[in-house]
């Protein structure tokens, strides 16, 4: 699978696909840098006036509801409608779904047309139980708790989507295929925007791989392997963030193999 990952990255860096981001303001800078490091070309637009034209230019669309307000909701809804009309993959991160009524409602609306969805266990569980409350962006459940809901959601999605449940162990399903990924490092939970950027990596991989399940699996593995390599070089989360960008850019598969093959 490392060879397939390497092929996807080569395509990314050759084609430099444009990824349109309707995303939160907290992690926008780090997210854009992650895109650049792996070879994608991010557009971080906040204007409705250029939305349709930018979607035409884009190979994939990424929506992240981290900083939610009424203007963002309108733009996110219009983004997904235009993307579906133009047959562009929609990658969705339902940040803090289940924490508030509005986040849960917006997430349900966007989920229906998503190509890939990534959330923590509590966020994914909120799609199966509208009465369940989460604790903001932090998960109060394990990946194992969300497997059945994730599988059911993937089967129900209109676009045949892949669902990724992030945690100490990641779970990926498209309703038919299932896999787990046990990679990464605890430092990843100490950097704001790490999950947002992981979902962005899915968007980049999906722009060059038509199979959403495979794109999601490769994206998780690449991002978490780079996290493990970054951890070798630092003792705290501040430098970890910088070294992660370096590793995303370097693509040192010889060093990755020690973790991938163990």
Curated annotation (Swiss-Prot):
Gene Ontology molecular function terms on file: ATP binding; hydroxyethylthiazole kinase activity; magnesium ion binding
Keyword Magnesium among record annotations: yes
E.C. designation(s): 2.7.1.50
Coiled coil: none
Organism of origin: Chlamydia abortus (strain DSM 27085 / S26/3) (Chlamydophila abortus)
Record has ATP-binding as a keyword: yes
Record key words, sorted: ATP-binding, Kinase, Magnesium, Metal-binding, Nucleotide-binding, Thiamine biosynthesis, Transferase
Gene3D superfamilies recorded: 3.40.1190.20
Chemical reaction(s) catalysed: 5-(2-hydroxyethyl)-4-methylthiazole + ATP = 4-methyl-5-(2-phosphooxyethyl)-thiazole + ADP + H(+)
Cofactor(s) in the UniProt record: Mg(2+)
UniProt xrefs under Pfam families: HK
SUPFAM superfamilies from the UniProt entry: Ribokinase-like
Gene name linked to the record: thiM
Purpose of the protein: Catalyzes the phosphorylation of the hydroxyl group of 4-methyl-5-beta-hydroxyethylthiazole (THZ).
CDD domains to which the protein is assigned, alphabetical: THZ_kinase
Protein name: Hydroxyethylthiazole kinase
Entry binding sites for substrate: 44, 193
BP GO terms, sorted: thiamine biosynthetic process; thiamine diphosphate biosynthetic process
Similarity-based family: Belongs to the Thz kinase family.
Pathway(s) per entry: Cofactor biosynthesis; thiamine diphosphate biosynthesis; 4-methyl-5-(2-phosphoethyl)-thiazole from 5-(2-hydroxyethyl)-4-methylthiazole: step 1/1
InterPro entries in UniProt: Hyethyz_kinase, Ribokinase-like
Binding, ATP: 118, 166
